């Protein structure tokens, strides 16, 4: 009754010298789960961490922390106007209610040379390859919808924003200088979703209203039309040329330079 997709029995750092400077990115932050097994039967005797810190509380905590730092919470319903986007600043919490479209590598490459199957003007593109399940009545349901790494779309994103009038890109990890310039020129923002919160974001999807390129690209790469409620993400690249990712990289390099002298003689 239980499908085991991955199992970590134990772990030991293989490169001790790197242990103290390792950085664990937040992709796995909300995926901690464990079980106590019966050694004779393999039966699950007890779940670990399952109800320890519900994801809803984690997300609320992240949003509350952002607000304490002076950020605003802004609710947007696509289609979104350029005026609404220009009012946003890095650090603001954006809550999306309404339509959203998924798009990964295959779709971005396709859109460079083709028209979109829907009108994307004022809309939101979500860098996501959702886990989907079709019920007995042929209706699709989202079972997991976490963000994927956005930098893979850097070769395409600026052109697609300009071509289709997209107002918001959602993903994780940020994007590069070309995309940042396009956000500024055309009035769009990049929203960083919470890595590893696939179950939480799946709960935000209230309906699947359509799908495009399913046969051509497959489930993860298809363009899914979603209706979402209370989909929260943080502005990390705004329409004024500001990038939190760029700022963090700069400050990190400055701090790293303080330790440039050899540690071991």
Stretches found by the model and what they are:
Residues 1-15, 102-231:
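Feature captures the catalytic cores and cofactor-binding loops of soluble hydro-lyases/lyases
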Residues 1-33, 39-43, 54-57, 203-265:
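C-terminal binding/interaction regions
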Residues 24, 75, 101-102:
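C-terminal extensions of enzymes
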Residues 47-70:
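Intrinsic disorder at enzyme termini
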Residues 70-80:
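Short, structured beta-strand/loop micro-motifs enriched in basic residues and often containing a Trp
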Residues 82-87:
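Short, surface-exposed secondary-structure edge patches
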Residues 88-89, 94:
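Short, well-ordered loop/turn sites that connect or cap secondary structure elements
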Residues 94-96, 100:
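Generic structural signal for buried aliphatic residues
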């Amino acid at each position: 009754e239980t499908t085991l997709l991955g199992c970590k029995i134990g772990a030991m750092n293989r490169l001790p010298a790197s242990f103290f400077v390792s950085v664990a990115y937040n992709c796995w932050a909300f995926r901690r789960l464990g079980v106590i097994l019966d050694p004779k039967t393999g039966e699950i005797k007890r779940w670990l961490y399952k109800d320890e810190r519900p994801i809803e509380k984690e997300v609320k905590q992240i949003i509350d922390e952002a607000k304490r730092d002076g950020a605003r919470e802004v609710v947007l319903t696509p289609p979104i106007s350029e005026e609404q986007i220009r009012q946003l600043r890095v650090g603001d919490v954006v809550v999306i209610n309404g339509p959203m479209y998924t798009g990964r590598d295959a779709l971005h490459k396709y859109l460079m040379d083709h028209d979109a199957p829907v009108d994307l003007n004022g809309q939101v593109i979500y860098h996501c390859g959702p886990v989907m399940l079709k019920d007995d009545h042929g209706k699709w349901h989202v079972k997991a919808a976490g963000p994927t790494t956005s930098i893979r779309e850097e070769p395409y994103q600026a052109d697609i924003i300009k071509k289709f009038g997209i107002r918001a890109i959602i993903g994780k990890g940020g994007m590069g200088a070309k995309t940042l310039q396009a956000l500024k020129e055309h009035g769009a923002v990049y929203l960083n979703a919470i890595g590893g919160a696939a179950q939480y974001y799946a709960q935000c999807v209230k309906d699947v209203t359509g799908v495009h390129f399913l046969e051509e690209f497959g489930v993860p790469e298809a363009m899914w039309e979603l209706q979402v409620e209370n989909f929260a993400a943080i502005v990390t690249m705004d329409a004024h040329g500001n990038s939190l990712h760029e700022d963090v990289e700069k400050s990190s390099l400055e701090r790293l330079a303080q330790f440039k002298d050899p540690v071991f003689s």
